[in-house]
Amino acid sequence: MTTTPTVLFVPGLRDHVDDHWQTHAQKKIHGSHCVAPLEHDKLSRDARVEALQAALAAIDGPVVLAAHSAGCMIVVQWAQKYRRDGIVGALLAAPADVESPMPAGYPTVEQLAAAGWTPIPRQPLPFPSLVAASTNDPLCSFTRAEELARAWGSRFLDVGAVGHINPPAGFGEWKQGEDLIRDML
């Protein structure tokens, strides 16, 4: 068993995006993995939680989770259902507020509710975590991100006016995110 944590990236509903910070970081962080994209039931919360569980089951040793957007909600939902020793930290970057309306092109609150995404769990996470929130994220207000961080027992970091930390917001690479992940290793 290895003692160096493995980084497991947990993408949001867009799954794998070539010019996303998670994709760039995965290439730079040796031995890291990414939860596999779903072939079917892409909006199913349960299917995504099970995909995370399968990815974790394939990793021997400690793990750092690096989640973005709805991936943060997958981590939180997973923690309600499963326990795994050795999760040494979780970066929850730009969590998506699945209880509030999202911009055009994203699922509606009703679609998300029907797919099991609501309500958002508000119990403390059983491992150390950090919510990194943008002051101008169109998918989650800064106030809501701060509220969720408190509920989850997460440290909270204001990363500035960086939108949703995705390609439409100008991210490709996100050096600060990579540094936050490395700090958990």
Regions found by a protein language model. Give the residues of each.
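Post-His helix in hydrolase/transferase enzymes
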Residues: P167-I181
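Conserved hydrolase catalytic core segment
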Residues: Q77-G89, V98
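Active-site catalytic motif of lipid deacylating hydrolases and related acyltransferases
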Residues: T2-G61
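Acidic catalytic loop of the alpha/beta-hydrolase fold
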Residues: D15-H16, T135-C140
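Short beta-strand/loop motif that positions the catalytic acidic residue
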Residues: L125-P126, L130-A133, D137
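Active-site nucleophile loop of the alpha/beta-hydrolase fold
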Residues: G12, P37-H40, A90-S100
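Catalytic histidine neighborhood in serine/cysteine hydrolases
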Residues: G31-C34, R150-N166
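Gly/Ala-rich beta-loop-alpha elbow adjacent to hydrolase catalytic centers
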Residues: L65-V76
